[in-house]
Amino acid sequence: MSRRDQTPAGDEFDGFAQRVSRVSALADPIRRALYHFVAHQPGAVSRDQAAAGLEIPRHTAKFHLDKLVDEGLLVPEFKRLSGRTGPGAGRPAKLYRRVRKEVNVTLPRRRYDLAGHVLADTLERIQAGTPLEEAIEQAAENAATIVLDSWPPTESSDVDRITGVLARLGYEPRPEGRAGEGVQLSNCPFQQLSDDHPGVICPMNSRFIDAVSRRLDCTDVHPTSVDRGTGCCVALRGD
């Protein structure tokens, strides 16, 4: 699978509550110190190493290390520290490493990872000889395809399908006017980037939402560029 096939649909599968729980687990000072200790070691850490490093009882280190595993912040592995194998080698020790997967909690919702992947994909296509505008279109289409493959919509109407997908990406769609008249996207998932680089990010965002709409074969609603104000530069308008 190429990197272009790995544009993240996001960590919504974990759920907002679970991500908050993971971050909240670090509110405990001992747990937070253990996490940082493990993260800064060159290899996996044993309970004895962690206890000695923080000068705390071993049973305290064990309790908090296992809590960090339960929250998905550390991953365990088992290894015989003596280096011996076979009968008499003893039981393998439980070791701990930091997980590679990042945990993001942003309020309002931000998706800088998605913007980064679209922009990186665009640059790779340009380096391969694709013209700029075509490269942006292809990268946006690729991102939309991967998002929809990850989150196949089940809603029946065009509006419900596209707003369901955009809601999961953090756009916060809200109906405006009379029923079927349109939908405002009240949050920009790329807010800081679009504030600093509106001439780059807003066109990219518009192409991405257009691509989502095309992939969903929406005919009753279409994306339209608007003055973004405090929200998104795109709104959905009914026919």
Label the model's feature ranges.
Residues 84-88, 177, 224-229:
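A short beta-turn/loop motif at secondary-structure boundaries
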Residues 184, 219-239:
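Short terminal or interdomain "cap/linker" segment that borders an active site or interface and mediates
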